Amino acid sequence: PAQFLEQFTMPFALENTLKYYASVEDFKADLVKMYKAFIEEIYAAGCRNLQLDDCSWGLLVDPRGPEFFNTDQAGLDAIKQEYLDINNAVLTDLPEDLIVNTHVCRGNFHSTYAASGAYDDVASFLFEKENVHAYFLEFDDSRSGGFESLKYVSGDKKVVLGLITTKSGELEDKEAVIARIHEAAKYVLLDRLYLSPQCGFASCEIENKLTEEQQWAKLKLVKEIAEEVWG
């Protein structure tokens, strides 16, 4: 929901959105209704595990955030709260057996990206207060920052560490990945940590710059590491 809101209310889009809505609040009310109706529909069809891909937080942590949103730091903090509120408004009163996860992405088009930045500036909003069961997080390079922000992950929420990049065919060093998992475990208990690729291998029509064989080698590595770390 936050990414939908972002795309229709960022400076380049807001004027056009307000041609159809009297206010942003009216737009947000419709947005919540739409998402709730969709979730109800797919739940009735059998969905019990819902993942929300959310690039909005990636733009907020980027050093160019004030430029993207045409605001200052106080304005960015207000936007973080707004995005948290819209997500949680959608994620209230859901069926107890529906698992909701979120993937925070910084862009994954043809082995390029849209944003950079550690999670620190959004952690107290996203990790502490968003009503999801698990976070799928990119941690495949220095653009993602360190693991310190994971200390904000509240309750028994799970964290899926995206330590295996999908942007390059180069295979990661197994022992280095295992070491990073144990580093993350300083902030979130190991039994609440998981491992995955950083994002999709073909998030868009134009796939990333690696071969199918390299893709499968990376997935095999994920499996091997998971078996070694968690048994």
Predicted regions and their residues:
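Domain-level signal for soluble alpha/beta catalytic cores
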Residues: P1-G231
